[in-house]
Amino acid sequence: MSQFSFTKMHGLGNSYIYVNMFEEQIPEEDLVLVAEKVSNINTGIGADGMILICPSDVAPVKMRMFNNDGSEGKSCGNGLRCVAKYAYEHKLVEETVFTIETLAGIVTAEVTVEEGKVTLAKIDMGAPRLTRAEIPMLGEGETPFIRENFLYNNHRYAFTAVSMGNPHAVIFVDDVEQAPLTTLGPVLETHEMFPERVNVEFIEILNDAEMNFRVWERGSGVTQACGTGACAAVVAAILNGKMERGKEITVHLAGGDLMIAWTEEGNVLMKGPAEVICRGVYEYKIEA
């Protein structure tokens, strides 16, 4: 029987099991199964996935993120805010502005601290990737993929594709509560045009500074929030002429609000909370 200490944290209800790999050890060959086991709501702790906080050669810390199906993602906005909180509060970093390595690249985090605790985290998510090769999608072309039609159940849905280190398909609807989240979501997620699968967001524009947001996450299904998805949604809204670049947008997710801005300089900034749920020790056994 093996075990490790964990901290369960969430960003707007998007929860992960966080493991401090500066102190713990999980064999590389076990990570996929451990992520599946620990995320299981019935036989594990229950979460949207597992995130490892690891040493890095190029930043103070490195984030590795696994979905609850065991697949490894390149980035996670809500996860980054929680990693930033954990790193500062556990003295893995000393400054309130620092970098985090991800499989999608290095991002900059800035934490707001009150009485030694991080209350907000702002992440510079970098520039969005908009070409088919960058997202990635099948096909050729260097122009952004904006409002392309997808036929489902005899209805045409126009989606815009954006990568924020992971792929997103953003669909604008009149009412997110009526959107085909659990039906169209998995169909589009696994469509052959997306070789690495895709996260699917449904967006309802409320005004020039607010939107409602629902998400079907690649590898996890319906979740309460998706930070990279909120960033992709704001980028897509600006590309479609629905919102203004350089302005801070409030994204209302099922789990709460994020503040997102696509700056004139090109990077996307995300600001929101990160909270600890519980801590403990998880025991597991990998069958031979």
Swiss-Prot record:
UniProt function note: Catalyzes the stereoinversion of LL-2,6-diaminopimelate (L,L-DAP) to meso-diaminopimelate (meso-DAP), a precursor of L-lysine and an essential component of the bacterial peptidoglycan.
The organism of origin for this protein: Bacillus cereus (strain G9842)
Protein's name according to its UniProt entry: Diaminopimelate epimerase
Active site: C76, C226
GO biological process, one term: lysine biosynthetic process via diaminopimelate
Gene name linked to the record: dapF
One GO CC term on file: cytosol
Pathway(s) it belongs to: Amino-acid biosynthesis; L-lysine biosynthesis via DAP pathway; DL-2,6-diaminopimelate from LL-2,6-diaminopimelate: step 1/1
Keywords tagged on the record: Amino-acid biosynthesis, Cytoplasm, Isomerase, Lysine biosynthesis
